[in-house]
């Protein structure tokens, strides 16, 4: 094969194998989880302390402030999954999860309300798409509400199974 250079402004019509096209989509992602339980102040938003990187080829996730800084302008898909535990049956009332942009704006929010049938734990997921500019940052937040205590965001399954019960991540989709 020959190498053909395409000048700016030209149109490409390809009948052969295309390589080297694409961009940064394959390397613009991250995933992190929490390695130990985190107790939250009741009915107060707090940042989820996802301190363990599972994947981050661009080194854009900071495990000290739990923040993902966007490397390039685009549309990103994010998710949070986790489990809150009140420690006692019938105590957990509700949980909000949110993704904050640049420290203040709630871009995505999800709520589970157990007020009519109070529970002990609530597994939640939040996912969605956010349009971001290079250098914007996003963080995972939660606000659990308990009848008589401070709920815990669980690092492992509330049913005793080993392995992570929480994760936060995302990737660029466009």
Positions of predicted regions on the chain:
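Extracellular jelly-roll beta-sandwich "head" domains, especially the C-terminal globular C1q domain
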Residues: 22-174
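Extracellular beta-strand solenoids
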Residues: 1, 5-6, 12-14, 20
